[in-house]
């Protein structure tokens, strides 16, 4: 299953400038997915991180992985229109290489477990086949804000 940006926006509450996934490919509900993030010089964080040497903050790579995991959790859980996935934990985060403008992040998420509404994922981010970051991520569903 493939999700284009409008499909992703139906599943996740994130919007510009914090929607960090452009496409999700190879989504297998209850199992795995691969997200794509095209990193451009137009990203707002490059204005200050770092001038003259733009590097995507590692925490935003983790957030991009979490967003892919949130989409997998939403599709897996089904019928959660009144709820959204919330990132609740991170373990074993490692950053291997910097990511910059022009890079295409491939975000591979594998669902390790889903019990009592808690989803646990293994996430790995790659650029050109090279591992740039990895982490274990946790998410739960909570009621959507009624603002």
Curated annotation (Swiss-Prot):
**Reactions accelerated catalytically:** a (3R)-hydroxyacyl-[ACP] = a (2E)-enoyl-[ACP] + H2O
For this chain, one GO molecular function annotation is: (3R)-hydroxyacyl-[acyl-carrier-protein] dehydratase activity
Family matches, as Pfam families: FabA
Keyword Cell membrane found? no
Q: Which residues form the active site?
A: 49
What EC number is given for this enzyme?
A: 4.2.1.59
Its name, as the record gives it, is: 3-hydroxyacyl-[acyl-carrier-protein] dehydratase FabZ
The gene for this chain is fabZ
Give the matching NCBIfam families: fabZ, PRK00006.1
Q: List each coiled-coil range.
A: none
* Cysteine-cysteine disulfides: none
């Amino acid at each position: 299953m493939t999700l284009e940006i409008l499909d992703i926006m139906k599943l996740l509450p994130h919007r510009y400038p914090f929607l960090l996934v452009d496409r999700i490919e190879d989504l297998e509900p209850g199992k795995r997915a691969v997200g794509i993030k095209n990193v451009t010089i137009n990203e707002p964080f490059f204005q200050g991180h770092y001038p003259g040497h733009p590097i995507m903050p590692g925490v935003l790579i983790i957030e991009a992985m979490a967003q892919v995991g949130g989409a997998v959790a939403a599709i897996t859980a089904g019928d959660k229109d009144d709820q959204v996935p919330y990132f609740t934990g991170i373990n074993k985060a490692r950053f291997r290489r910097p990511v910059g403008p022009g890079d295409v992040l491939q975000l591979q998420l594998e669902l390790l477990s889903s019990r009592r509404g808690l989803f646990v994922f293994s996430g790995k981010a790659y650029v050109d086949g090279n591992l740039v970051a990895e982490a274990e991520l946790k998410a739960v569903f909570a009621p959507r804000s009624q603002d």
